[in-house]
Each structure stands twice: as C-alpha cells, then as structure tokens.
C-alpha cells in the first residue's frame, strides 16, 4: 500500500488528557512489529508519529505563507488547507497531534485541520477534575485558574495575536465544547477513548485503538507495547533521557502520577461544583461523575 493510500490520522485531545501516552504506545507498537530485536524506546529520539497540527513551521511550509503576518481571522480559515500536499502522507508520520477544537470562532465554519485524505480521528478525553490538576502542574498555575480555564469559552493555547513562536494559536473553548467539537463532527470517523479506560481496561482499549488505526493487532505485540509504555515505565524512560523534550520550562516532569481521582482529592468542594455545573451534560454523557449539585 502506498503512503497516499494509507492516509493519515489525527490524535486529538484537550491538553493533559493522554495524547502523548497514546502517541508513545503507537510508536512502540510499530517498533515491536518492525524490528526483530527492538532497542529500548528513547522518548526524545523515537517519538516521531507526525506533526502537531498547530506547528507554525509546518503550516507555513504547507500553505506557502508567513503565518506571523496573519491575524486569527485570516489564518484559521486557511489552516484546513495545510496537509493537502503529499508530504503529509509520508510513511511513518501518519498520526498527527491536535489540541485545537475541530473548528474555531475564526475559521468560518471550516475545520482548522485538513480532512482531505484523513482516515479518521482518535479523540482522547479525561475527567475534567483530573485535567485541572494535571494542567496545574504542567503550566505551574493555581488550581483556581485551571478551573476557570476549563470553563472559558475563549480558552486557547498560544493566545497572543500574531505571536511568532513555534506554534500558532489553538482555540479550545470550554472543555465540553472541545469534546463535542470532535466527538460530534461528521466529517471524519472518530474513536473516543477515555483516559480512565486506558488505565483500567488497557488491553481492551489499546486493542480497539490498534484496530481502528489499522496497526498490528497480534495480542502479544499489543500487550508488550502496553507494558513497555505503562505510566511507571514512561516515568523511568523520562529520567533516563534527563527530561522529556515536550516538558515546558518550570515543569518538574512531564509524566507525573498518571492516576485518576486526583481532582476529587485536591479540588475544593466549590471548585468541583463549578465544574459539575458548567460541564454537566458532557460529563454525564461520558460517565464522568462529579459532586451532587444541591
């Protein structure tokens, strides 16, 4: 099968929901299937599943523009064109990370990612209470600010207008809006994976992932890839390379506890009520419990 026939996929998520874990698993499964004697995974060398959809260099290369010269209203409607060239289908770089919502307020009703040749999207989601705690450690923000962030309809990564950094603005909106933007869109096939199931039902959940993506589904391979990329193993691999390159400055480590339920332990009752009230419909839809609202 040619690279173009193989197509490509998106791995979409709200930040700190398990996207990197998913990418590492895909990398390891492919390595185990391809190498007779695979070497131990090096996080800073081997994790090359594809581009992040918000990469400024990648977008500029694909669209032939300087995105620093464009406003959000000018850039977002164009972003869906990126990837229409054959480069996106390069062998070995077929799984592209996305933190944007599927559409933005500035994209004029169009997706901010290319859908031409895309075979589907894996949407990874996590209990919003636990996302708050993980974001707090990742951004070095107080919990209160992270609660407000998940409830902010204008929330974005790299929010500055005409910012010249490595990534462009990624509109996410409220946590529930982000989930619905991907789970309910009808332009691409979608597999929704809950972080909680990745932990509690790993064999079943990652086998479903491999099947959806057309990756090797031999039970022994999937089990070995899962064992090699457990959260505890990833923490050790991060230590071995002296820190994961995707860890922001000021963050002690990228792979932290990986547990579920930290939000319920660390958030105040009022903060949990804020999330439950604001995100109730989507939390209930995906079986995420919260505090009772009296």
Task: State the predicted function of each range.
Residues 217-220, 268:
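Structural helix-adjacent loops and short alpha-helical linkers that scaffold large soluble proteins
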Residues 216, 228, 281-285:
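Hydrophobic alpha-helical segments
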Residues 18-32, 192-217, 225, 233-234:
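PAPS/PAP-binding and catalytic site of the sulfotransferase fold
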């Amino acid at each position: 099968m040619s690279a173009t026939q193989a197509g490509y996929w998106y791995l979409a998520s709200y930040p700190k929901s398990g996207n990197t874990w998913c990418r590492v698993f895909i990398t390891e499964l492919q390595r185990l299937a391809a190498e007779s004697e695979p070497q131990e995974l090096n996080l800073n060398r081997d994790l090359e599943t594809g581009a992040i959809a918000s990469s400024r260099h990648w977008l500029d290369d694909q669209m032939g523009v300087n995105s620093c010269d464009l406003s959000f209203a000018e850039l977002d409607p164009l972003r869906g064109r990126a990837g229409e060239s054959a480069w996106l289908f390069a062998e070995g770089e077929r799984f592209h990370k996305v933190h944007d919502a599927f559409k933005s307020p500035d994209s004029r009703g169009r997706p901010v990612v290319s859908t031409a040749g895309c075979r589907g999207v894996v949407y990874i989601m996590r209990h919003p209470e636990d996302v708050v705690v993980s974001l707090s450690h990742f951004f070095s923000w107080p919990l209160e600010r992270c609660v407000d962030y998940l409830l902010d309809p204008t929330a974005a990564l790299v929010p500055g207008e005409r910012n010249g950094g490595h990534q462009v603005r990624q509109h996410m909106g409220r946590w529930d809006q982000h989930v619905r933007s991907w789970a309910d869109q009808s332009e691409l096939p979608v597999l929704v994976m809950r972080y909680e199931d990745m932990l509690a039902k790993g064999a079943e959940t990652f086998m479903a992932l491999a099947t959806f993506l057309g990756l090797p589904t031999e039970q022994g391979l999937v089990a070995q890839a899962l064992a090699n990329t457990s959260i505890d193993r990833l923490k050790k691999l991060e230590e071995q390379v002296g820190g994961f390159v995707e860890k922001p400055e000021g963050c002690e480590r990228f792979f932290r506890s990986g547990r579920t339920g930290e939000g319920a332990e660390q958030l105040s009752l009022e903060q949990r009520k804020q999330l439950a009230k604001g995100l109730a419909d989507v939390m209930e839809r995906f079986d995420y419990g919260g505090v009772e609202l009296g």
